């Protein structure tokens, strides 16, 4: 982490090139009295007072509640102690580094592409142009005091890692898909890459609001590549009758990753998320969905967790209005010494009549040393619904393995075929 919203540098007294800290050290610093007392004197406090209010409220909440623990339902099975034991390399700011700009210069040869790096937004040339119904970006360079002050009010404190991510984010960004764009960004999807600017074990954070305005149809291809520590807090606002499709791929390149995704679904909106993940030394991927009336939500995950990697997930959907549809279908495959967990919760209020929900989580262990947990939680307060769930953990079917080997298929290839069949 190089900067926070209201601090020019973080842990500057520990910013030696060869010194390491952990996540608790960073949280302790940004919630210290000295840090909070300096907020009124910061640059952005005068320009965007609402930012200061939101940021300070987040810090005070973080100071009171601290980092998430296993006592919280969503982290009951997560090996959260492994996350807190990760060493993070202290580093001075690279915010204006030519090397960083050069690292992402490949965008010049792409179209409909965005890179998010430590709250910086880099775009391909076509998205950087001002034209009717093009994407609008509000960041520390392209500012609009009134609009940004309204958007930042959406960043409310939640019982997860989003508070930490926001506290360590240099600047919260907003990416707007205007209603007049219709299905322009659906026919030609937008690629959103989450990247580290270094392969060193530093930590970089992004807090981003994606606003899909009414009647707009948007397709995002999200590519998360973790070469170092990365924390992402992304909020997706689906306005009335908006449609959003996300295809997210997360690959391990030696780092670790926390990704909190919050979806605010207005009436008549449609959300589809398809994702894959390999896990990492620690990965936490959470989805929080707040559904208004007549919404449709599909969350489909197919994850192959690599040897020794950690992958933990919490999916929460809240429905307080009628006629909502939901399908959560997540399958995990764990290789040797992998550790995974899934906790899914439906919270259906008394006014959410005709809710139609299906929650499935299937897990396949490829080795006896794999650890996999799964738990569905249904909190239903109305009888006028249709809801079903199924969560399982199983081993490779030896009968299927024997059959394939009897046909001349070697054991490794047979295992790969069974995994591919499981994840299809």
List each model region and its residues.
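A local structural micro-motif
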Residues: 70, 411-413
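Catalytic-core signal marking the mid-to-C-terminal active-site face
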Residues: 49, 415-420
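Small-residue helix-packing motif on alpha-helices
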Residues: 62, 414-415
